[in-house]
């Protein structure tokens, strides 16, 4: 990556603002998620809102919406597949971004690598729960979902810790804005996730009408806050370009 500037070099073959690349990558699962929810409500309402105890429910769970019926399953898998490789590239970019930030803490370099590892694990288990739906193999899908949530929480926590340790209130306006939104979205994500667990337990214990609808809505907020957290890359890479150059140009 190089800073955005008027000169791109004679050997530059392709360039793209990294903000466009990073946010566009996250937009793929966002589109797929919204499509699956809307399509399920319009065309597969009864199939995707059914509950094990047959109480009234008005929203499909995330698993039912993305993996229960077609074409939702195909759209979700296509978008997740397309966004996966770029997500790993964004992870590498973040690793270099954090490593390039001066910090006197002896634990900082290890936190950078831990953050990258957690990010890779999050992406891997997202792929697993995507391509093994709950209707195909419930146990594997459940494992993928639980691991995805665990690594997502870990990644967000370590990311916020890196910013707190390295920045300590300093940095540009964009960096301070990014850090502020990261903290808000992580807190909201954690609150919605814990709330969804409590509501899910309540549903399984008492099977009351509408409770599973609340659970599904909380799931949606968990997913959207996760995507929002990753979209803070808009501020982190605002002055960078992704460039592909011929061998004569050493910039990448």
UniProtKB/Swiss-Prot annotation:
Protein's cellular compartments: Golgi apparatus membrane
GO biological process entries:
GPI anchor biosynthetic process
Q: Which ranges sit in the Lumenal compartment?
A: 44-77, 133-142, 206-208
Q: Can you tell me where the transmembrane regions are?
A: 23-43, 78-98, 112-132, 143-163, 185-205, 209-229
Q: Which GO terms describe its cellular component?
A: endoplasmic reticulum membrane; Golgi membrane
Which enzyme class, named as a word?
transferase
- List residues in topological domain: Cytoplasmic: 1-22, 99-111, 164-184, 230-252
- What's the name of the protein? Acyltransferase PGAP2
Q: Which organism is it from?
A: Xenopus tropicalis (Western clawed frog)
